[in-house]
Amino acid sequence: MSCLAALTKFHEIYKAAFVERLGELPRCFTHGRPSPCLADDALAGSEEPQPWQMVPRREVAVFNNVSHAMDIELHHDIDDFYGHLFGGPLQFDSPWGEGELIQIWNEDDFVLLQQNILGHLMMKKQLKQPQTWFVGLIGDVDEMVSVNNADGTVWREVAGQEPHEQLAESLEAFLQQLKPRVAPPQYHQEPAATVNPHPGIFASLKRMWQNLTGR
C-alpha cells in the first residue's frame, strides 16, 4: 500500500467513524473559507462548524518550487500526502497519544503550506540539522509529526530541535497505526493582526511557525 492509498483509506475510515457515532459527516470551522470538500448543505460563511468530506484534486499538486528553492529533492511521499486530496483536519488517536494530521482545505491552503514547509526547511538548514517536513501535530505540547526527507521515516519533533523519537519506518506505516478520534471540532482564536486562519491547516501551521520563528 502506498502513502496515498493509506491516507485515502484513513479518510474513508474517518468519515465512517463520524457517521456511525454521530450520524453525520466530520465538521470543522471554515473561518469563511470556501473549499471543494464542503458538503452540499454546508455554509462556508457560517460561524458554526460545517460538514466536510475528502475530495480528490483534479490535478495533482507538487512541491517542485520548494525543491528548486532549497536545491534538494524532496521525498516523493510529500506529493502523495499533500498533493492529491482536499480535506479537513484529521484528529487521531495513536500509540503515542492524540494528534492531528494537516490536510489541504483549498488552493490558498496549499500555497500557505508550501511557504511554511520552505521556512521549516530553511530553518533546518540554518541549524545544520537533518531535513524534515511536517504532516501534523501530536501530544499536548504541539510537537510535530515529521518525515525525514532522506529516508521517509516518521518522527516526533519539537520545532527547532532534531527529531527525537522514531514513530514508523514510513508515512504509510504511520498512517496504518492511527485511529479516528471522534470529537467536536476545535476553534482556534487568531489575533486580529495575523493572516486569516485556514481550516484545512486548522491553525496548526501558524502555531508551528510561531514556534520556529519565536513570534
From Swiss-Prot:
Record keywords, A-Z: Cell inner membrane, Cell membrane, Membrane
Membrane topology: Peripheral membrane protein
Gene Ontology cellular-component annotations: cytoplasmic side of plasma membrane
Entry superkingdom: Bacteria
Residues forming coiled coils: none
Major site of localization recorded for this protein: membrane
Subcellular location: Cell inner membrane
Keyword Glycoprotein: no
Biological role stated in the UniProt entry: Interacts with the SecY protein in vivo. May bind preferentially to an uncomplexed state of SecY, thus functioning either as a chelating agent for excess SecY in the cell or as a regulatory factor that negatively controls the translocase function.
Family that this chain belongs to: Belongs to the Syd family.
Listed name of the protein: Protein Syd
Organism: Shewanella amazonensis (strain ATCC BAA-1098 / SB2B)
